[in-house]
Amino acid sequence: RDRKYVVCNGDEGDPGAFMDRSVLEGDPHVVLEAMAIAGYAIGATQGYIYVRAEYPIAVERLEIAIKQAREYGLLGNNIFGTDFSFDIGLRLGAGAFVCGEETALMTSIEGNRGEPRPRPPFPAEKGLFQKPTILNNVETYANIPQIILNGADWFASMGTEKSKGTKVFALGGKIKNTGLVEIPMGTTPVSYTHLTLP
């Protein structure tokens, strides 16, 4: 049986971005749940979350959440008494911006210098350890449980015809309200200026 991997990119490197950190600090279990669901869907038994070492609270909460999930039988062998086994490891990024690129991130998880690989082959064919891999960011994984609970039509009812759902943005700078805002895809800057006017 060929090994497959599920990888989460929690290494947001854009200046002023803290969307991933907020999710990982506030509700790390939602990402673990989504990764296990993804693992089940593709037949993977191992996942990795790649997170910035500069996010010590996120790292600590992820470590606690992974331990709790293992204790409750939500990660590990024979989840819910089935033949499905899936576990998640945590890998800390060293702050290299290039590791936000998916192939560089996988190279870093493998223990090598985080440098991009030529494509093709694409990660779905030859990704982590040269095995089929799905890689998504924190926000994408965090959406999965909500879509399963509320249905695809619910998610598709937000956004535009070509870009469904919502997007989280970090608002900063010389504005009235800083922080995170989740808005439907396709929302124009004019639509949310009331959030940001000084």
Residue ranges, per PLM feature:
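Hydrophobic alpha-helical positions that pack around
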Residues: V59-M185
